[in-house]
């Protein structure tokens, strides 16, 4: 059956749907309007970054209502309807392969919070599908949970679906649960039948070639306890989901979700940039285009919601998806549009133009999206070529030896060339080669282990002893450091010395001490541990240099040196924190909270913490950002922080249930594990964060704040280092000393240093310019001897020659001089070796470009590639470089052959 005939068959399957607006945008609005007229509040899609810090991405429409379903939040509405943007990557290998798998999709949903239940949900679902959308009732099947007789009866007796089209299914298909315990219940699904002529007998709803599930109704009526027993819920809820892409496929009469108007415009854009027609493509090309269409939607919406490419968490999903787009685009031959350096932004512009109905913010954030796509694509392109070459060699070896690709090799591609494992697996699968996934994971684990070992600072033997101590004590240390920096009476619960638990440690011993009560802060949350002293009544003194947690955080361990006397287990000590160090750590910690708020104000609410260190001398703050802040932005951040310091704002710290902290809007760090009760540090109107660290009581105590540096530490991760409080004074003193030294060396007053340096720079530039001019003259002199080597090809004068020891700028001057001497029809390619490096230049005048169809960039690009490099330029002039001078002669020969062939008379 031809594609046109199949489309006609699909379109004619639902006569009542014809004549209606069945565009994706219209289906979305018709769904929402249908439920709005039935008392549902129309609510916007929530972010792809969910409130719950334990969930990576929004994967279902019900996620924004989960606290209501779980009884953790009061309901604002009894009924609601939404269109929710979702991202799932668990079926990423099926994207483009099957008709309906996606990473990004829209879930249309209607919800009831203790209001209507099964009967209304089933009736409205049927009315929507067969009435509003006009589906042929004879093509709609229903599934119910095998034990849900009530739902079966509603579908049969109330809605009127024949028993022959109602299927009872097992728990894995038709029973929903949020987890092992909590709200749960049976569900009922609506399926569309593409081939009813196959009959009722033996029909299998799992047959994807015949059926598509398009609407799922979850009846949350039960609560499952820890023992597995279920009891009825007091309030029964409805949670439904209809895949917009699936309904669009049915109503638009197309064979798969990708050919709907929700995705096809993106695919067509990619195809046009590849110079191909989707309808004329083979299956492999179509699959590649579908991957591009799907993944481009996903990354556009994710970046709009503040998720930027990185190597961790959500950011890695963006990176992984975008790299799949880039690779498939390369395989299709997609090139950037004229004037552009990357091709993904042009494709994303189509996705953005179609986003209004789902999320109006996407269009508003278009500049951010396009900039991030360009940055990440160009970054990946730098390593992709080398990685592809290595992978091709590995695959050829695997074919010859009839072995799969080893996990070690797959990891090398990942670690060295930035190749995600799934891309390696994709390429290998295309070549019929398997990948040792277990070996990859082993190599990954080994690297993590080595990394952890390299950063290990705690003695392993001592750590084991402390773990045993924690188990033996069965108690926890009590921290009183929020209220006080000293303790008059603390009992020594345990002493570890030399990796062993001891009863007594002599003078000079380095020990780990566990106290029952301590004012010492143990390193956590980015803040370093306190230092200070311990004293016993009989005159022993211990200098504390570090404080850590052990035993799963139950005990606080003081690393100390016995400087006087001896210390015994069971002794009572006075514990005194060094107040100057604590004051500096507190100032730096509060400053990081202010810094995060300032970054959000200046760079956008998308900024989130990726790590921090609050030491005694300075602070460090890592954050997610796709690009470096400008100097002006950093100054604005600095001024904001200092402004808040001068406001003398009082801080409050309060413990509360984590649900209450979320409701207050407290900032949480993704990936951090929080207990049921959390500590919220609040600078009213400025900052509110979950934090267990020590802080100043008033921002004025910080005194001042100064940024020292800002830099990228990983893709998508930036780092700011700064000082606060006393550190600012010390910085000013140090810089004042440097200024005085410079003034003395330059023999000018401090205020004239800038002018004197500018004058010296001008002198240097003039000298460099003179040197460059002399090198150019030397190159021209050398090139003069080459004019006689030019050969006439047709009406052109072709000169391809080697001019060693000449830098790129001088090589360009030489080419221009030769062109002037050769006159009309000049076609010049020059190469120069400087050690192992290669410089290349090509110059073609207008006549050469017209007669031979030659482009300097293309000719030079091929030559540079032979020398292990690259480059480009305009049709008339191009420059390139390489890293393998041994191939320069071969590269020039290839260029000569290309130019001669193009210009020879036909």
Curated annotation (Swiss-Prot):
Subunit structure comment from the entry: Monomer.
GO cellular component terms listed in the entry, alphabetical order: chloroplast; cytosol; mitochondrion
Main location: plastid
Domain notes from UniProt: Consists of three domains; the N-terminal catalytic domain, the editing domain and the C-terminal C-Ala domain. The editing domain removes incorrectly charged amino acids, while the C-Ala domain, along with tRNA(Ala), serves as a bridge to cooperatively bring together the editing and aminoacylation centers thus stimulating deacylation of misacylated tRNAs.
UniProt-recorded name of the protein: Alanine--tRNA ligase, chloroplastic/mitochondrial
Taxonomic source organism: Ostreococcus lucimarinus (strain CCE9901)
GO biological process: alanyl-tRNA aminoacylation
Subcellular location: Plastid, Chloroplast; Mitochondrion
Residue numbers binding Zn(2+): 589, 593, 691, 695
Top-level taxon: Eukaryota
The EC number(s) this enzyme carries: 6.1.1.7
Composition bias type Basic and acidic residues, residue spans: 1-10
NCBIfam families: alaS
Alphabetical list of Pfam families matching this protein: DHHA1, tRNA-synt_2c, tRNA_SAD
Record-linked PANTHER family: ALANINE--TRNA LIGASE, CYTOPLASMIC, ALANYL-TRNA SYNTHETASE
A GO MF label: ATP binding
Family matches, as PROSITE patterns: AA_TRNA_LIGASE_II_ALA
Record note on cofactor: Binds 1 zinc ion per subunit.
Class in the EC hierarchy, top level: ligase
Cofactor names: Zn(2+)
Record keywords, A-Z: Aminoacyl-tRNA synthetase, ATP-binding, Chloroplast, Ligase, Metal-binding, Mitochondrion, Nucleotide-binding, Plastid, Protein biosynthesis, RNA-binding, Transit peptide, tRNA-binding, Zinc
Signal peptide residues on this chain, from the entry's feature table: none
Region (Disordered): 1-22
Reaction(s) this enzyme catalyzes, per UniProt: tRNA(Ala) + L-alanine + ATP = L-alanyl-tRNA(Ala) + AMP + diphosphate
Similarity-based family: Belongs to the class-II aminoacyl-tRNA synthetase family.
